[in-house]
Amino acid sequence: MERFKFFAWPFYIVCVPVIFLISCKQKKFIYKSPPHYNFSNEFRDKLDLRIKEISGIVWDNQSDEFIAHNDEKGIIFYLDRDTKGIKREFVFSETKGDYEDIAIAKKDVYVLRSDGKLFRIVTDSTGKQNTFDAGQLQSSGKNDFETLYYDAERKALVILCKNCSTDEKKVVSAYAYYPDSIGFDNKALFTIDTKMVDSMSPRPTSRFQPSAARIHPILKKLFILSSASNQLVVTDLNGNDENVYMLAKKIFPQAEGLTFKSNGDMYISNEAVSSKAELLKFPYIQ
């Protein structure tokens, strides 16, 4: 019996590390990309230091350029479609604020402030730009918004709660703004079930907080970024969850902006972490 123990002990010492290493290898997390994209094959552009704190970006199909804005300053920047350099800028508000996202409805540009206020930027036939107060969502309690997108079928701009007190962290509410008629509808357009997001996520986080969203021009699905949880959530246009993808921190250190070109190419902006902000391009794969 003693002899068996003598030979079994070295075997145990050798096997345990081997089993441990195999176990670690099996647990290595694999990041998956949504259909038609490869998130490990990005094209990366560094952005001007003036938009170091880029909070939103949108592609303008009519002018064939990107429009972006900073987090705290009331300035929008027009970026060259190829170099991503700043072509021109426009001060839409002299007041510092928490400006979170940008969208285009028809020909007008809209900027969302975190308290649910919208700014409308109109360019007339001479090229002169003016800013108008487009209204503010009236909702009880403390509310924080970071996401604004345009729904062409509804003919409405939609804002998503990042953290709204009435949601009680159980859902994420969406509210519609109708620029051609009533303005804001203070009743929720739809809600996104945060528990469902967690149940579908490869890594449940309980931190789903939308930071940007756009409707895919080809797939007609809603793509939602959540920087806080490093997730890309795909839903139908009524907020019903369909897929959840985890975003690698080394590629998306602080993903704050999302937009698409009409051909399906996806662009995600990273706010600067150490030096310059970035704009990542992910080509649409047929």
Predicted regions and their residues:
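Bacterial Sec-dependent N-terminal signal peptides
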Residues: 1-36
